Amino acid sequence: MKVVKLADIIGTNRDVDGGNWRSQRIVVESDGMGYSLHDTQIKAGTETHLWYKYHLESVYVIEGEGEVETVKDGKVWPVKQYECYVLDKNDEHLLRAKTDMRMVCVFNPPVTGEEVHDEDGAYPLPEHMKPLNS
């Protein structure tokens, strides 16, 4: 067993600033759990294009409100505190924060902890892993 304190992650290579967002990676690939767990903050008034081509993600909103638009069909999903949205089909999406948002994100497969989004809004797949849904 181990205990990870958020305060111990802030300011390390697991505390990643992506411009519109900042994410502290609490559990990562090297922890051997098969998923990663992130505490992510999104800035109010921003729109972020995301497309996790190699990862599935569940997002539990613990503060704030916004909306997620799935690019494929243009459907808009309002999300707010104490709601969870699940990107179970590698959905390309736009995240719009109406207010500052804080969320707990779970990724499968796990990230290493230092990733930032590429030009498509994706995290790279670790070389030794096979993509989900392939």
UniProtKB/Swiss-Prot annotation:
Pathway involvement of the protein, from the record: Amine and polyamine biosynthesis; ectoine biosynthesis; L-ectoine from L-aspartate 4-semialdehyde: step 3/3
Tell me which EC number(s) this protein carries.
Answer: 4.2.1.108
Keyword match Phosphoprotein: no
Q: Which Gene3D superfamilies match?
A: Jelly Rolls (2.60.120.10)
Q: Name one Pfam family in it.
A: Ectoine_synth
Q: Which GO terms describe its molecular function?
A: ectoine synthase activity
Q: Does the keyword Lyase apply?
A: yes
What EC class does the entry list? lyase
* Keywords, in A-Z order: Lyase
What's this chain's function?
Catalyzes the circularization of gamma-N-acetyl-alpha,gamma-diaminobutyric acid (ADABA) to ectoine (1,4,5,6-tetrahydro-2-methyl-4-pyrimidine carboxylic acid), which is an excellent osmoprotectant.
The record's annotation in PANTHER family points to: L-ECTOINE SYNTHASE, PTHR39289
The family note in this entry says: Belongs to the ectoine synthase family.
Q: What is this protein called?
A: L-ectoine synthase
